[in-house]
Regions:
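Short, conserved, GDST-rich strand-edge loop motifs in beta-rich repeat architectures
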Residues: 61-73, 126-137, 222-239, 313-337, ...
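Beta-propeller fold detector
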Residues: 97-102, 136-151, 190-197, 254, ...
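Blade-level signature of beta-propeller repeat domains, shared across WD40, Kelch, NHL, RCC1
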Residues: 347-403
Length: 403
């Protein structure tokens, strides 16, 4: 058996250190998205839209979650497009879990580090910069303060996962147009690649391109639910038509998947989430097959890998069941209920080391990013006084220069 790294130490899937019921209101959140104008009158039986400023959420964690984050000096950034939430999850000086939330409508792909975070939203791509110097804190507890410095309007592209190229440019999965894109100074996006089976760029979400794996600072692999080249063609092909595509060669390197998501290259392997089955695993390139490693009880979406440890996002079904997916049968076989939350797992032993669980109005997560070297982060929102009053600057003016 391989030796465990410090990140893999102290598996503690039992017990709860923190259980918080929170009802968000105007005073609790930083920004509130304006309601969209409906295209048509809603059905009398339709579920009312969720008010993003007034949701009730209960969070619980494994007993060792806070200490694990603290001892490894790492934090998590999570998104939930359903509730428009970004959660920064860190630890305080006592090793207790710290949750810091902000509202960004339809928060989707997120990727970041100690200095910078990118976030995909409903119609903008956000860039946040940390304004704190080393060993500096704000509000006496936060060692990183991510401030929105740029929001590029791209339109509603159903933006999914993001990556950072070695030249510093952000690349994103443009799901609506079935392509990979970069930002354009003039237009909504610049298409840089599309799957070989997609005949044209059209706003039709043909194959549900969704996940992106970066390798050596370049986009290398993507996941798609199927190879459809017709409008919305993926919805009837969720069971076993999923593929992984090599962006450089256009080769299908894995097939027969069920709603694959979140490919990640780590330590010589391509890991991904076969969401329709509930399994985390890796790709056998010789057989072009998925090798399942461990089952997680939920629809898997959002994966971040740090050393031999992964953070896996889990979501509940939208209509009580994962209809047409093997995941339903797997849950029934294990007498398990689906989760909404995060499981920290060892890629060596496939054990769950720690976990976070959400209950209440939040039932779906989208993306996860480890923030190495960050202990307790915060993020400035759009509707608090901080967005107006928190001003920092750099200067090229020599001190003491006379007027």
């Amino acid at each position: 058996m391989a030796n465990k790294t410090p990140l893999e130490a102290s598996p503690d899937p039992q017990g709860v250190v923190e259980k918080i019921t929170q009802e968000s209101g105007p005073g609790d959140v930083s920004e509130a998205a304006a309601p969209a104008v409906p295209d048509a009158a809603p059905s009398p039986t339709a579920k009312p839209p969720l008010d993003l400023t007034k949701i009730k959420v209960e969070k619980s964690c494994s007993r060792g979650m806070g200490q694990w984050l603290h001892s490894n000096k790492v934090s998590l950034a999570l998104t939930s497009y359903q509730t428009g939430r970004v959660y920064m999850v860190g630890s305080d000086a006592q090793g207790r879990v710290s949750f810091f939330e902000r509202i960004f409508e339809r928060a989707m792909g997120i990727v970041g580090n100690a200095d910078r975070v990118y976030l995909g939203g409903l119609y903008q791509l956000w860039r946040f910069e940390n304004i704190l110097r080393p060993n500096q804190v704000i509000h006496k507890v936060f060692d990183r303060c991510y401030v929105p410095r740029n929001a590029q309007t791209i339109g509603d592209l159903d933006i999914h996962e993001l990556g950072i190229r070695k030249n510093g440019r952000v690349v994103f999965v443009n799901t609506k147009y079935s392509c990979l894109s970069e930002l354009s100074l003039t237009h909504s996006f610049k298409a840089i690649w599309k799957p070989p089976f997609i005949s044209k760029l059209a706003p039709e979400d043909r194959c549900h391109l969704n996940g992106l794996a970066m390798k050596d600072g370049e986009p290398k692999y993507v996941t798609a639910v199927c190879r459809s080249d017709s409008v919305d063609g993926w919805r009837d092909r969720r069971h076993d038509a999923g593929v992984v595509i090599d962006v450089e060669s256009n080769e299908i390197v894995c097939e027969g998947l069920s709603m694959p998501h979140s490919p990640r290259w780590a330590d010589g392997k391509l890991w991904l989430l076969n969401a329709g089955t509930g399994y985390l695993g890796w790709v056998d390139f010789e057989k072009k097959a998925f090798v399942p490693q461990m089952f997680c009880p939920g629809f898997l979406r959002g994966l971040s890998i740090l050393g031999n440890v992964a953070a896996v996002g889990l979501s509940k079904p939208r209509n009580k069941r994962f209809e047409g997916l093997a995941l339903d049968e797997e849950l029934s076989k294990r007498d398990a209920d689906p989760w909404c939350g995060v499981q920290i797992v060892s890629l060596t032993t496939c054990d769950v080391l720690q976990w976070i669980r959400f209950e209440g109005d939040i039932t779906e997560l989208f993306d996860i990013s480890f923030l190495p070297g960050v202990r307790n982060p915060m993020m400035v929102g759009l509707r608090t006084p901080e967005i107006r009053e928190l001003i920092t600057f750099e200067s090229a003016i020599a001190e003491g220069t006379p007027a």
